[in-house]
Amino acid sequence: MSVDSMLCDRIDIAKQLIKRAEALSRSRVGGVEGGAKLCSKLRAELKFLQKVETGKVAIKESHLRSTNLTHLQAVIESAESLEEVVSVLHVFCYNDQFGEKQSLVVDVVANSGHTWVKAIGRKAEALHNIWLGRGQYGDKSIIEQAEDFLQASSQQPVQYSSPHIIFAFYNSVSKPMAEKLKEMGISVRGDIVAVNVSQENSPEENYLSGSESDCDGDDTSVLHVSKVDSENIVASIAFPTEIKVEVCKRVNLDITTLITYVSALSHGGCEWIFKEKVLTEQAAQERQEKVLPLLNSFMEAKELFACECAVKDFQSILETLGGPAEKERAASLVKRITVVPDQPSERALQLASSSKINSRSISIFGTGESLKAITMTANSGFVRAAANQGVKFSVFIHQPRALTESKESSATPLPNNYISSNQL
């Protein structure tokens, strides 16, 4: 292929990838985090290639082959192959084995955060040579990168489990490297190719080669005289169609969830226009999307907990604002819950108080963390404020519903032809 035809091909690929990246960004309600960054990188690549096309930039054929498009295409193909992609090109911070702060880019975060993917576009031979110490100075081998991923993932638990790591190879990976990754607990996706042992070196040279190397494994001398056979594919591994995730079976109920669960709004009482604007808005939200089925679905087959301060304050609010049916539902709900003493985690106790962070929320969310439970809440303000201080809680966030049964007597029934402002 000539340089000109290769350039045209690269430009076409870049344009197609931009369309796919834009579609990926829209594939999730609220968008995929990092989608804009991915599109921006692709547009920068396209702009560069178009400058080459017009003669504004001179480039060698070898440089044209090694543009970032290969990697960005691998990122998009990985994201398109997985479910519940929440972010791409996400930067995680972690402490390395020496306690130094480091950052790590995860190409795709999928399955609601439970899966991390590194997409690799480089050829198997180049990756294998770097592993053997034959790369350029400063090149980090895939095995070393895998160690970084394991270190970082252990510090970024999702629902109290470390994310599962997949290394996706789009230009193959050598069998010894694939086996090493599997030993480390990392899944491999892509074509696995054989390695042929060269007979060029004498036994003495083999011995020296092995003794001077800092590569992994006891068979280094063999690896050092080996060559990747890209034509000999010994296995092809696709992305798993269903990645098993260890589901947390414990749920911690926040006050907002307790109120939402028993609210008249959540039990059919949403056909009202209340004097309070916020209640009318919540009624409209309930008519649009019922919250109780979502709560029941998440709580199903799980152990329910609530800390003492949450239950105490819930009952106090209920006594003041609750209607008869809401109080009856609350009594039934509390019977299903294991009430535990307030026991906030160390991380929660380190949070600085603010307009969004108070001692009650620290106790509730911190107790959930101590229990290794997912906290159900409508208090997204606290969750964001805590995250801004570097403390991310395992949460299930839902829309709020207030206690409204006692307000129905002063409310107006919804007319048949009523259209709310958010429907206009």
UniProtKB/Swiss-Prot annotation:
Spans traversing the lipid bilayer: none
Superkingdom field: Eukaryota
Similarity-based family: Belongs to the UPF0415 family.
Protein name: UPF0415 protein C7orf25 homolog
